[in-house]
Each structure stands twice: as structure tokens, then as C-alpha cells.
UniProtKB/Swiss-Prot annotation:
Residues 1-91 form the B12-binding N-terminal domain. It comes from Methanosarcina mazei (strain ATCC BAA-159 / DSM 3647 / Goe1 / Go1 / JCM 11833 / OCM 88) (Methanosarcina frisia). Pfam families: B12-binding, B12-binding_2. GO terms for molecular function: cobalamin binding; cobalt ion binding; methionine synthase activity. Acts as a methyl group carrier between MtmB and MtbA. Pathway: One-carbon metabolism; methanogenesis from methylamine. This is Monomethylamine corrinoid protein 1. Keywords: Cobalt, Metal-binding, Methanogenesis, Repeat. Methylcob(III)alamin binds at residue 107. It comes from the Archaea.
Amino acid sequence: MANQEIFDKLTNAIVTQDIAGCAKLTQEALDAGISPLDIITKGLSPGMKIIGDKFEAAEIFLPQIMMSGKAMSSAMEILTPELEKTKVEGEEGTGLAITFVAEGDIHDIGHRLVTTMLGANGFDILDLGVDVLNETVIEEAAKRKGQKIILVGSALMTTSMLGQKDLMDRLREENLRDSVKCMFGGAPVSDKWIDEIGADATAENAAEAAKVALNIMK
């Protein structure tokens, strides 16, 4: 099977919530010599983007999101050990990534993938999980004031995305904004939104998120 055919089948497995098929294809891709990064960026991530766009357009609903998440998990169980083998040791002081999904949002497909990719690129990780209060993010950032920190938040829904603006406002109120970098992602998040709320960056996918995070933490 040609690489592109495998990538297309992986994308389709995410979109159709084919959990067993996604795991099988992931292993086949590895066996064919395809790198874990290519499997993620060219096969799995496009499927996640389609799912996110469909959810934003109300073409699918939470149960389908959860099943696609399980398909992604089945792939990541296979890929994470492979990513660990090729883990990039970060330069001294690469920093701590505090990752979280916005309050009111329980999807974690992209969140888990971004967290994995950040860890594979040398970041220390503090994963706060899903449905995280802005207050919790503020508390964790305040505890570590003076360290190199990047906040990496995810939101799949427009309603939960709005909390990102509140978080940025709170960071400024608490005099924490200058001590952290802020990157947000998710289907509704755009460059325009990032500029509007005064954050530092967004990214199209998990691999790009890791590159962007490394760049803005230099």
C-alpha cells in the first residue's frame, strides 16, 4: 500500500470512528517504515480537523467526537512509545508546557496529541486535563512565576473558546502575562482571534504546535 493510501485510510478511520481499524492501520504504517510524525501529521491530524470542522458546523455531535477520540487513542497507544524513542532532549531551559482544555469543554483529542508532541520535543509537561477553570491555570502559573512557561490551551467549541479571552485578561490583572507565553488551538481558533485577545500563537496541528512553541520560547 502506498503511503498516501495509508494516510487517507487513517484519516477516514478517525472520521468514521473506526477504533480497531485505526489501530490496525497505525501498526501497518509503522511496519511500512512510515515515521510516527508523518502518521500523525499526514494521517491522523487531517481526520481530527475534519471532525472539528464538522462539530463546529453542527454536522456531528459529542458522541461522535468521543468515538473519534477513542480511535485517536487507539493510534496513540501504539505511537507514543515510538515517539518516546525519538524524543528530542530539549536545550537546557526549553521550558514547562502547562496544557489544558478550556472550561466547559471535555474533548481531548487534539489536547492529548499536542501534549504528547510537546513532550517529545523536550518540554516538561503539566497536563491539567479537560474542563479546566481559568482560576486553576492562573494558580499553576502563579506558583511557577519566574520559570519559563508556556500555556497551551485547547477549545473545540466557540463557547469554550471565549474563555481564552477571559484567561488573557486575568493573566494581565494578576501581573502574570509578561512571565508566560500563551498558545491556543482548536477548530474555532484563528490568527485573528489570537491577535484580538493578545495571545502569542496558534497552530494548525500538533506537530506545528510543537515547532511554534519551541520558537516562541527561544
